[in-house]
């Protein structure tokens, strides 16, 4: 790497005047969280709709998985049911092997192509079989990523132990059995540059990054990390660019940092002095950082700044492609819509807005404004309306239970699933209550999000505060969400004609996982304030042929 290589002339000028909504809301949120008293989760058990999994096996999660030729392969067969459980996989491509006790498929595949693998899970009460399509080619993240991110609970105070406890909780709580697989470290891990690549090294809160990644991989999970092309991140740690050719930022040299190498000006105000770190630098250390992440075994990158620009997006894309492992590339934040083709071409996910908050105003304004991204949402490329704000959140260090009502939380998860949005849990998983767990472990709802077609739902009807979204699924059925954004319970309905269907159809309640009725014309239901009814419409068994547009 050449540390003296500079960015093109148009990109040199620091962006000092561009104040983002993200930064304002994030910092205000941190202050509010710091002042709030610590809370415990209330008893929300009466609102649980998701049935408990059966003792017999059910294979869950994505039905299609993409990997690039020669990249390291890690896929854990997600399955519910009592343990012990054994797994088998027929038709694995050359280079892959299965651990029958853990269900982990590992190895490397060099031959491009599509491989249909027949999976089986068996325990004492029974067995389950399902196909998995492995696509060895140029695309990864063929379904929206599902995992956890540290920001919405720990923010800049995140530690190695908190990340590790979150990974353990993902496994021990059973979330991994439903397809959740990423453990992503957000801002706050960075120390100063060093090592053989002169790359960002972890601060003292992360004493053994390589060991941490290895331990999480040994659980069958994947690991994500965070950076920025600014010289400093939103939380004022160093970024992948510098204002000096040796990579040591001027504020580091002058000692304007705390024990974790976070920017800290003596007698100064971080918010007032933010422009000293929130800007692009002339010297790129992207290549060095990417080499380090590859050696650690990183699987996911959140690259965060505003405004996004083509040069830095493509630079990181190209660097990540030099690795012998696949790294999901997620852009943040507030991606300009006019450049959507570029975000789709060079990234796997792109944040469409600033930071989400745990309020109805935030989740509804973000969630119901995603329609324009529909032409760019597809397997391998996902518009990202931000993380899930359920459970214990707070942006560090003191957490509080989400301010969303139960109905608003059902709307949150249902809408994100219909949108084919990345699903990143933002709460402290070690404190997860039963209601929050029920929201995250409903496999029939997750199936809507992880459907192999990768289609974003479209609004098929809207009147005032009521809107109906519909989404075609791979098996020929349709997922339909009836949303009431108003303050009063209302009756809502859809006709088969509205959905482009005909014939006898079975309407199934996805949250309760039970069939409601057979429908030949119209389905009607009551929808609570700020609530949703999420159903799946299947062709009936009357002998009539149901046809979709």
Q: What are the functions of these language-model segments?
A:
Residues 94-111:
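Strand-loop-strand motifs at the edges of beta-sheets in extracellular beta-sandwich domains
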Residues 410, 416-419, 424-426, 462-501, ...:
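Carbohydrate-binding surface patches
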Residues 77, 113-125:
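A short beta-strand micro-motif common to beta-rich folds, especially ectodomain repeats
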Residues 45-47, 126-137:
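C-terminal edge beta-strand
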Residues 152, 166, 170-310:
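Aromatic-lined carbohydrate-binding/catalytic grooves of carbohydrate-active enzymes
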Residues 518-544:
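C-terminal beta-strand-rich structural cap/linker in extracellular carbohydrate-active enzymes
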């Amino acid at each position: 790497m050449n540390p003296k290589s500079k960015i093109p002339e148009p990109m040199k000028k620091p962006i000092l005047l561009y104040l983002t909504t993200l930064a304002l809301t994030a910092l205000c949120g941190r202050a509010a969280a710091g002042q709030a008293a610590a809370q415990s989760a209330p008893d929300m058990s009466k609102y649980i709709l998701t049935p408990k999994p059966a003792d017999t096996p059910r294979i869950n999660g994505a039905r299609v998985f993409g990997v690039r030729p020669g990249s390291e392969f890690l896929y854990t067969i997600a399955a519910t049911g009592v343990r012990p459980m054994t797994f088998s996989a027929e038709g694995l491509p050359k280079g892959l092997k299965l651990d029958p006790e853990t269900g982990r498929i590992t190895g490397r595949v060099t031959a491009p192509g599509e491989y249909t693998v027949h999976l089986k899970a068996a325990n004492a009460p029974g067995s389950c079989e399902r196909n998995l399509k492995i696509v060895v080619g140029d695309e990864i993240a063929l379904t929206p990523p599902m995992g956890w991110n540290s920001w919405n609970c720990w923010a800049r105070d995140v530690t190695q132990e908190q990340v590790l406890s979150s990974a353990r909780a993902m496994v021990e709580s059973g979330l991994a059995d439903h397809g959740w697989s990423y453990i992503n470290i957000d801002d706050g891990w960075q120390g100063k540059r060093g090592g053989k690549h002169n790359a960002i090294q972890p601060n003292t809160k992360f004493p053994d990054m390589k060991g941490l990644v290895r331990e999480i991989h040994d659980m069958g999970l994947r690991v994500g990390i965070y950076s920025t092309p600014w010289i400093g991140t939103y939380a004022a740690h160093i970024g992948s660019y510098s204002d000096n050719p040796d990579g040591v930022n001027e504020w580091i040299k002058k000692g304007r940092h705390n024990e974790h190498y976070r920017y800290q000006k003596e007698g100064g105000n971080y918010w007032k002095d933010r422009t000293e770190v929130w800007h692009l630098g002339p010297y790129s250390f992207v290549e060095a950082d990417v080499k380090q992440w590859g050696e650690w075994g990183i699987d996911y990158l959140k690259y965060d700044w505003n405004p996004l620009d083509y040069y830095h997006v493509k630079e990181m894309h190209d660097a990540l492609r030099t690795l012998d492992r696949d790294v999901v590339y997620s852009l943040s934040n507030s991606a300009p819509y006019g450049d959507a083709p570029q975000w789709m071409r060079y990234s796997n996910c792109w944040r469409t807005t600033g930071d989400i908050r745990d309020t109805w105003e935030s989740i509804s304004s973000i969630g119901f404004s995603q329609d324009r991204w529909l032409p760019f949402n597809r397997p391998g490329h996902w518009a990202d309306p931000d993380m899930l704000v359920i459970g214990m959140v707070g942006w560090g260090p003191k957490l509080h239970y989400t301010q969303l009502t139960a109905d608003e939380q059902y709307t949150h998860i249902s809408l994100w699933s219909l949108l084919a949005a990345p699903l990143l849990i933002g709460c402290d998983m070690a404190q997860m209550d039963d209601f929050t767990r029920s929201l995250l472990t409903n496999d029939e709802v997750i199936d809507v999000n992880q459907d192999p077609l990768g289609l974003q739902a479209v609004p098929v009807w809207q009147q005032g505060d009521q809107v109906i979204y519909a989404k075609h699924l791979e098996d020929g059925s349709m997922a339909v969400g009836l949303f009431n954004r108003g303050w009063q319970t209302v009756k809502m309905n859809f006709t088969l004609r509205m959905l482009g269907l005909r014939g006898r159809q079975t309407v199934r309640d996805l949250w309760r996982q039970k069939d409601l009725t057979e429908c030949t014309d119209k389905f009607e239901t009551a929808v609570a304030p700020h609530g949703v009814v999420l159903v799946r419409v299947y062709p009936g068994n009357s002998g009539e042929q149901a046809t979709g547009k």
